[in-house]
Amino acid sequence: MEEDLFQLRQLPVVKFRRTGESARSEDDAASGEHDVQIEGVRVGLEAVELDDGAAVPKEFANPTDDTFMVEDAVEAIGFGRFQWKLSVLTGLAWMADAMEMMILSILAPQLHCEWRLPSWQVALLTSVVFIGMMSSSTLWGNISDQYGRKTGLKISVFWTLYYGILSAFAPVYSWILVLRGLVGFGIGGVPQSVTLYAEFLPMKARAKCILLIEVFWAIGTVFEVLLAVFVMPSLGWRWLLLLSAAPLLVFAVLCFWLPESARYDVLSGNQEKAIATLKRIATENGAPMPLGKLIISRQEDRGKMRDLFTPHFRWTTLLLWFIWFSNAFSYYGLVLLTTELFQAGDVCSISSRKKAVEAKCSLACEYLSKEDYMDLLWTTLSEFPGVLVTLWVIDRLGRKKTMALCFVIFSLCSLLLFICIGRNVLTLLLFIARAFISGGFQAAYVYTPEVYPTATRALGLGTCSGMARVGALITPFIAQVMLESSVYLTLAVYSGCCLLAALASCFLPIETKGRALQESSHREWGQEMVGRGTNSTGVPRSNSGSQE
């Protein structure tokens, strides 16, 4: 009774009385307002009219009806065998994405020497991949919201696999430039695997599972470096490109096992398909389905850009765009800076080293040595502790504070590089900086799918991913071009950018820790319900949201 009383106090709607007797007078009926007496407590209620055909939200339904939403089913079924399979399959997509990114740092110097390419053509080979990713990220998000998460992910994977294999047979520079750009276009859809994955996860496991999926990114980068160590000296870069497509090939074969998101099916009106998917998951996990009838969410337009800029989401969208931009800008900038700093020994040696090589021919080149591959491997390994730290703090501090913490520590490490330090301390600072900037990236991947409703979740993640590619596209001009003029200005740019990103994280209006995924963008249906759990005092939480 205490729980019913709390809901009646919080929700401005009429609930049926269990006695079945009417407590309204004729004046009440005319005004649409009346009081209800429950065990001596009078509660003022207000009648709300529903549009014809509109689904009645569970919170407002007759308490004698047994109904449930997709969120209830996912929570009841829990984490089990199905989610483990999905974790591995989603991880393969992330592993393939990481390998395609890591191969850029291996392929560029190889083609520079083999085809005698000038420096600007080598740089363009990297930039064209990010241009493809930047231009397609929003498109893949729109496709996933309009036609389904599985559809968008499958098309992007087959696209990337096809052009990735063709890249290995490119006869001349112009061909590989076009083909790698098309590979980048396909990679722009890989982040949609996180959207699909998150929508099948119970609330308590969501953050940990998404972060653990990011481990596959680190595994992919390590695997690519190890593959290059054995393949490049004997078989060459063409075989490296072919073998690097292996995770995508495995994913393409197994992706037919993937179900469509039940949340998407409900939102698009496919109730029977959603129920079938939920029953399949319950069977695989050996868990019972909730009793009753699945409530269909109000059908609405999906994948519309304007929905990201409604008054409720406008500020969140703009701040997230800057956060994602800063993440990629700093992450890939650090990757480029690492090679420069290792070759120079420390920051103070860079300027003199640059002057010494200015007179060298632009076509001069050096093949990557085994020592170079080991340096790449060492810096890549720093992402594993980054995952562990983020995993430990994200459910303790919350998503916003975790992102802010990662940005602040990266900024401090960048500032400490101003000091003329030895190689060992330099390596330690670079290790810590990369661990935390990768941790900030991972926290953003947790937060973004949680903050947007199902109707715009894929588009929101896609546009954020697109802004990240803008940062990745710009950062070579800072980490390589500006570095030649002033190493201190370069470090100041990265440090300042991350400090601003930390502030942006703090100013995000919604904290998604302990919050259920939103099904609808309509606030009147309680879009910011904080799960169906309780707060620290054991009192059920209202639908006022988690805004701070």
Swiss-Prot record:
GO terms for molecular function: transmembrane transporter activity. It comes from the Eukaryota. The keyword rRNA processing does not apply. Residues 1-87, 144-156, 202-209, 260-316, 395-401, 446-457, 511-548 are cytoplasmic. Residues 523-548 are annotated as: Disordered. It is a multi-pass membrane protein. Keywords: Cytoplasmic vesicle, Membrane, Phosphoprotein, Synapse, Transmembrane, Transmembrane helix, Transport. InterPro entries: MFS, MFS_dom, MFS_sugar_transport-like, MFS_trans_sf, Orgcat_transp/SVOP, SVOP-like_MFS_dom. GO terms for cellular component: synaptic vesicle; synaptic vesicle membrane. It is found in: Cytoplasmic vesicle, Secretory vesicle, Synaptic vesicle membrane. It holds the Pfam family Sugar_tr. The modification Phosphoserine is found at S25, S31, S542. SUPFAM superfamilies: MFS general substrate transporter (SSF103473). Detected in brain (at protein level). Detected in brain, in synaptic layers of the cerebellum, hippocampus and cerebral cortex. Residues 109-122, 178-180, 231-238, 338-373, 423-424, 479-489 are vesicular. Belongs to the major facilitator superfamily. PANTHER family: MAJOR FACILITATOR-TYPE TRANSPORTER HXNZ-RELATED (PTHR23511:SF5), SYNAPTIC VESICLE GLYCOPROTEIN 2 (PTHR23511). This is Synaptic vesicle 2-related protein. It comes from Rattus norvegicus (Rat). The gene is Svop.
